[in-house]
Amino acid sequence: AQAIIPNVKEKFDEYKNNGDYVILTKDTHHSDYADTSEGRKLPEHCMYGTKGWEIVDELDYKNLDSFMVCCKSTFGFDDWDWEETFGIAYDSSLLDIEIIGICTDICVITNALLIKTYYPEAKITVDASCCAGSTPEKHKAALDVMESCQINVINRN
């Protein structure tokens, strides 16, 4: 994940220069994590209030003009109602959404497919150079699946 930080910093600059609205989803787990389905299968991570829960300092997202941080307790953010949740009126055919982040094979793919399900006419792009998977093989497999689900994947190196 550390290897993508320079690319993500550049992407944030691009978003800022374009005046884009940025939504950051943030894994947020609590003391009961080990008792959850996810917690029984994955090691403890992103525990609320710890350094591992924070967005890394190198990504100065607060410099973005328009952003929102949405905490999520599992792989995907489950409230992608643009108008109700974010106060953004939309015509789904006009939505142009780019997704970046970690973990490609868990969180990125889940959110991409959720958004595609809610908004099938939206243009959804995943920038592979700004994503990291749990392994290189799973990263590639997730990108392949997203492409097969009509999600545009760019910068596959």
Label the predicted regions.
Residues 14-32:
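Von Willebrand factor
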Residues 32-38:
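Metal-dependent catalytic neighborhoods of phosphoester/phosphodiester hydrolases
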Residues 7-20, 43-157:
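Active-site-adjacent betaalpha module
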Residues 1-3, 39-46:
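Short glycine-enriched, charge-decorated loop/helix-capping segments at active-site entrances
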